[in-house]
Amino acid sequence: MVLAFQLVSFTYIWIILKPNVCAASNIKMTHQRCSSSMKQTCKQETRMKKDDSTKARPQKYEQLLHIEDNDFAMRPGFGGSPVPVGIDVHVESIDSISETNMDFTMTFYLRHYWKDERLSFPSTANKSMTFDHRLTRKIWVPDIFFVHSKRSFIHDTTMENIMLRVHPDGNVLLSLRITVSAMCFMDFSRFPLDTQNCSLELESYAYNEDDLMLYWKHGNKSLNTEEHMSLSQFFIEDFSASSGLAFYSSTGWYNRLFINFVLRRHVFFFVLQTYFPAILMVMLSWVSFWIDRRAVPARVSLGITTVLTMSTIITAVSASMPQVSYLKAVDVYLWVSSLFVFLSVIEYAAVNYLTTVEERKQFKKTGKISRMYNIDAVQAMAFDGCYHDSEIDMDQTSLSLNSEDFMRRKSICSPSTDSSRIKRRKSLGGHVGRIILENNHVIDTYSRILFPIVYILFNLFYWGVYV
């Protein structure tokens, strides 16, 4: 009886405790699975819960920074001394220089430093807090703008490139990545052997020197550049930072910061594209001095071709430059070169004209003699290339001799033998030809020497002055 009672009691206790044992067994199995298959995931979740400062922090950043308790439309220390705002710049690249528009495009990091005690917060570790662009719309930030800028924007890939860092004592750092296109007043009087001085100017738009003091944070070291920054047509000689004051009659004096840089143009590109073709055209025009004076089409065509080529070079250079009201160095060189090419054409015109005049004189002197020796003057001049049959009025009556003059001249000029007649004919023709050749070639001969010498002297003077 007692044994039966104990058996019933043990069975009853077992039925009651069995769910708890199973539950404990399930918990143990679950823990083992977590330890084996999801061990890494569990650790990550535990770490995230431990490091989640947003949940650990008892208040929002608006409350921590007293955003709701202060009027951030007013500058820090309003009514007192001007707020100091330090600036430093890291130039990432100079993207382009446009001579036509007289501007440049620059990408850089702009950093502002100031102190706003309204943003101070307690911190045991003395660590700063970093925010993105959203907080900049709720607090006071310096209103820096770029003087003489045409276009500017803050990069927004993948979000707006704005970083705001607030320290416990109220010191604030604002960093932006900006691209600006600004004016650069260029002087092209020495182009393309020029050096340009450009500057980007920073200034507060609303706050004059009584409210905001703008200065370079680290002096001359506040401006930094990339080590291997370069341009296709310019060599960057110098980067420097400076400061000054700007006066506006209606609002007063403002602090202004300057980012100055000096650009020296690479001249080798223009030597290949402009100077060398111009020199070749001038030298090609000199070939005309060695071509026979009778080759009218060859010399005229060569002269016209060189003149048109020089005009094309001048037009191409002018199209890529702003329309300034003064001569540039390249204009001086191209126009003087064009003058040499043009003078070579004028030289042949003078040679051809003097040859024509001389041959007319010789024709008048030898017309009657040529008739006695049965030389057709019209054919002789046509062969020379200076006259045509239609240009000569051959009046037979004027060329005919009366019988008395003919007999008298015949008695004087008729040779005694055939050999003496041939000798006299050669002597007469050689004398006339020598006169024509001498009068014609004297200009070409001097031009072959004079043109190159003068052009070389011009080049020595030009490069000596501009280089």
UniProtKB/Swiss-Prot annotation:
Domain remark in the UniProt entry: GABAARs subunits share a common topological structure: a peptide sequence made up of a long extracellular N-terminal, four transmembrane domains, intracellular or cytoplasmic domain located between the third and the fourth transmembrane domains.
Native organism taxonomy: Eukaryota, Metazoa, Chordata, Craniata, Vertebrata
CDD domains membership: LGIC_ECD_GABAAR_rho (cd19005), LGIC_TM_GABAAR_rho (cd19059)
Reaction(s) this enzyme catalyzes, per UniProt: chloride(in) = chloride(out)
Annotated signal sequence range: 1-24
Entry's family note: Belongs to the ligand-gated ion channel (TC 1.A.9) family. Gamma-aminobutyric acid receptor (TC 1.A.9.5) subfamily. GABRR3 sub-subfamily.
Quaternary state and interactors: Three rho subunits (rho-1/GBRR1, rho-2/GBRR2 and rho-3/GBRR3) coassemble either to form functional homopentamers or heteropentamers. Forms a ternary complex with SQSTM1 and PRKCZ.
Protein name: Gamma-aminobutyric acid receptor subunit rho-3
One Pfam family hit: Neur_chan_memb
Record-linked InterPro entries: GABAA/Glycine_rcpt, Neur_chan_lig-bd, Neur_chan_lig-bd_sf, Neur_channel, Neuro-gated_channel_TM_sf, Neuro_actylchol_rec, Neurotrans-gated_channel_TM, Neurotransmitter_ion_chnl_CS
Biological function: Rho subunit of the pentameric ligand-gated chloride channels responsible for mediating the effects of gamma-aminobutyric acid (GABA), the major inhibitory neurotransmitter in the brain. Rho-containing GABA-gated chloride channels are a subclass of GABA(A) receptors (GABAARs) entirely composed of rho subunits, where GABA molecules bind at the rho intersubunit interfaces. When activated by GABA, rho-GABAARs selectively allow the flow of chloride anions across the cell membrane down their electrochemical gradient.
Keyword Transmembrane helix (UniProt): yes
A GO term from the CC aspect: postsynaptic membrane
UniProt keyword terms in alphabetical order: Cell membrane, Chloride, Chloride channel, Disulfide bond, Glycoprotein, Ion channel, Ion transport, Membrane, Postsynaptic cell membrane, Signal, Synapse, Transmembrane, Transmembrane helix, Transport
Positions annotated with a glycan in the UniProt record: 220
Disulfide pattern: 184-198
Region entry Interaction with SQSTM1, spans: 347-448
Organism: Homo sapiens
Regulation: Inhibited by TPMPA, a rho-specific antagonist, when forming a homopentamer.
Gene Ontology molecular function terms on file: GABA-A receptor activity; GABA-gated chloride ion channel activity
Side of membrane Extracellular, spans: 25-266, 321-331
Location of this chain's protein in the cell: Postsynaptic cell membrane; Cell membrane
